[in-house]
Amino acid sequence: MRSHEIFQRMSPTLAAEIFTFLQTEQKPVYKAAIQGLANQRNLRGVFIERKPPAERFPWMQAAFGRKISDSLASHVLQSWLLGANKQMLCDFLDALEIQHGEDGTVDELPADLPKEKIAAAADRLLGKYPTETVAVYLHAFRDMDSTVQWPALDEVLAEEPRLKL
C-alpha cells in the first residue's frame, strides 16, 4: 500500500494526531508539507495555515490521499513514525532480531524473514500499541524500501484483520 493510500484509509482522528505532532514537534517538516501541498494546488502556504485545524486537517488528509502527493505523504509518515513512534519501531525490529540504531533506523534489512516471525512481531506490537497506529506503521514499512520485499509481511497484512486499514 502506497503512502497516499494509507492517508486515504486512515481515520481522521489518526490523521489529526499525525498533523498535530508534526506541527508541534517537527515544525520544518510540517511547513514543508504544507508548502508542497500548496504548490500542487497553486495556492500560497499561508492560505492552508490560516484554516482552523478542524478544516485544515481533513483538507490535508484528503490532499495527502491523492496519488500526486505520494512522496510528500511518505515523508510525513516517516517523520511521524521516526519522531512519535520510535519505541514501536524498535520493538518491531527487536522482535525480528534486526540490528538498528537508537532511533529505529536500519542500515540493511534482511532479504526475507519467516512468516511466523513477522506474525509474532506484529502480534507483539498489537498487544502494546494502538491497532491503527500499528497497521499504518506496518503498511508504511512494507512500502518504504522498494529494494526489500517481504512476501511474508504481505501475507500477514492480508490475513490479520486488525491490520486492515
Segments from the language model and where they lie:
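Short acidic DE-rich linear segments
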Residues: 162-165
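Acidic, low-complexity, intrinsically disordered interaction modules
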Residues: 24-151
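Charge-rich, intrinsically disordered N-terminal extensions
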Residues: 151, 155-159
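Short terminal alpha-helical segments
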Residues: 1-32, 97
